[in-house]
């Protein structure tokens, strides 16, 4: 049973992503319609695959900012229910999305997080992505302050090693749902 994490006071501001929480579910829906790359990306809902909570929506992630001529794309706009933070949900979703990107000929996939969001940065690094640096004053946060973005990437030449690492993490978990 997932709690409504769009409400204020459900976590530290820096763990909320670039937009922060909203006061009501309706406000969150309005935010989501603007925030996610509906027109320029493939937005994926992430659901529980088995067990008593099968089909429960637990998050979202997007493959977007497609630049086919430069063979690069961006995985981002990711948000998961805190109940699944630190589980195999993110590695499994990213394994599928990275595979899709590299199978379709992209040579570089960018991932990024707010520079002060240590949890998200650690999750990206644990995927096997390489830290490239900080883009300063990248985008505004909900509170009006500016976010610096920590930028990471995975190249096509690195993908076999990254894929093997993600598959090993999933194998350690086994077939049981989260």
Residue spans of the language-model regions?
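Amphipathic alpha-helical recognition patches that constitute DNA-binding helices
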Residues: 74, 92, 108, 119, ...
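Acidic active-site catalytic centers that drive phospho-/nucleotidyl reactions
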Residues: 117, 128, 148
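Conserved acetyl-CoA-binding loop-helix of GNAT-fold acetyltransferases
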Residues: 86-100, 122, 126
């Amino acid at each position: 049973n997932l709690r409504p994490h769009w409400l204020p006071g459900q976590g530290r501001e820096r763990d909320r992503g670039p937009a922060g929480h909203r006061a009501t579910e309706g406000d969150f829906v309005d935010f989501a319609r603007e925030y996610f790359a509906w027109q320029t990306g493939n937005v994926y809902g992430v659901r529980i695959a088995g067990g008593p909570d099968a089909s429960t929506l637990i998050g979202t992630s997007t493959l977007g900012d497609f630049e086919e001529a430069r063979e690069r794309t961006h995985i981002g706009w990711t948000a998961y229910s805190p109940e699944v933070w630190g589980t195999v949900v993110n590695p499994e979703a990213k394994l599928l999305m990275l595979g899709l990107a590299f199978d379709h000929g992209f040579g570089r996939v960018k991932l990024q997080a707010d520079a002060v969001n240590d949890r998200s940065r650690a999750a990206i690094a644990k995927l096997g992505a390489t830290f490239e640096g900080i883009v300063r004053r990248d985008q505004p946060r909900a509170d009006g302050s500016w976010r610096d973005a920590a930028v990471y990437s995975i190249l096509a030449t690195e993908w076999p090693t990254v894929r093997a690492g993600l598959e090993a993490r999933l194998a350690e978990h086994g077939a049981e749902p989260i």
